[in-house]
């Protein structure tokens, strides 16, 4: 079964069983109960120590927050607000700065994530700011999307640590000017934003450290049939320091 508790809703004493699906918004007045991971509670716009199990979803709305959230296998989280200490486990999916509720998509440049750990899970950054993130494991992915129309580019700040075969991908001119990127046995793929005119995808980086790692620059992996034959699309990466 499916239980959705959205803006202004209340649900207490929830007992989520295997196979059930629970979708919760931090704009709910109060949600509490148990799942396969133990007790959880969301109240007054704050989710704290919530471990989402299989089939669970959390939507962090603007001006609300989630603290120390764990996304287990196949759980999802969409954040338009602030989250701190989120852990994204295998097969879980996290989205920053974007929410899709029943086909209605909302973006937010105010979204912020701090001190995230991605362990074989996936995090998509659509808008907002990600501060200090580590991603590891062969199935671990951190993907930063190209700037959305009418929204500032997504920003990476502080340490970005990619290791143990994980993948780091950026599309177009995202803001990495305040990021210290460390690649260990991993790869960073920088994907140009293809247009019909000449365009230089420029990335400025505070520092880049590499150990048994690769930085790959490429066009969007799509057909160029709509791109003018004479168009030149290229990538420029500038870093204050390069080591490794």
Regions found by a protein language model. Give the residues of each.
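The right-handed parallel beta-helix/beta-solenoid scaffold, focusing on the short coil/turn
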Residues: 1-3, 9-12, 18-21, 27-29, ...
């Amino acid at each position: 079964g499916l239980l959705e508790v959205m803006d202004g809703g209340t649900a207490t004493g929830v007992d989520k069983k295997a196979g059930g699906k629970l979708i919760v918004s931090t704009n709910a007045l109060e949600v509490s109960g148990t799942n396969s991971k133990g007790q959880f509670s969301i109240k007054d716009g704050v989710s704290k120590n919530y471990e989402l199990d299989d089939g669970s979803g959390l939507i962090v709305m603007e001006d609300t927050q989630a603290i120390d959230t764990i996304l287990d296998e196949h759980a999802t989280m969409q954040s338009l607000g602030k989250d701190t200490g989120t852990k994204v486990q295998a097969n879980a999916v996290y989205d920053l700065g974007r929410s899709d509720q029943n086909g209605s998509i909302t973006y937010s440049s105010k979204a912020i994530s701090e001190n995230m750990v991605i362990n074989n899970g996936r995090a998509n950054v659509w808008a907002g700011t990600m501060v200090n993130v580590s991603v590891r494991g062969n199935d671990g992915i951190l993907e930063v999307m190209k700037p959305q129309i009418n929204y500032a580019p997504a920003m990476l700040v502080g340490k970005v640590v990619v290791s143990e075969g994980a993948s780091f991908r950026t599309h177009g001119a995202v803001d990495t000017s305040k990021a210290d990127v460390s690649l260990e046995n991993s790869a960073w793929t920088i994907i140009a934003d293809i247009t019909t005119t000449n365009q230089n995808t420029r990335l400025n980086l505070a520092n880049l450290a590499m150990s048994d790692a690769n930085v790959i620059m490429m066009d969007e992996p799509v057909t160029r049939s709509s791109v003018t034959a004479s168009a030149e699309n290229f990538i420029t990466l500038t870093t204050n320091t390069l080591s490794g």
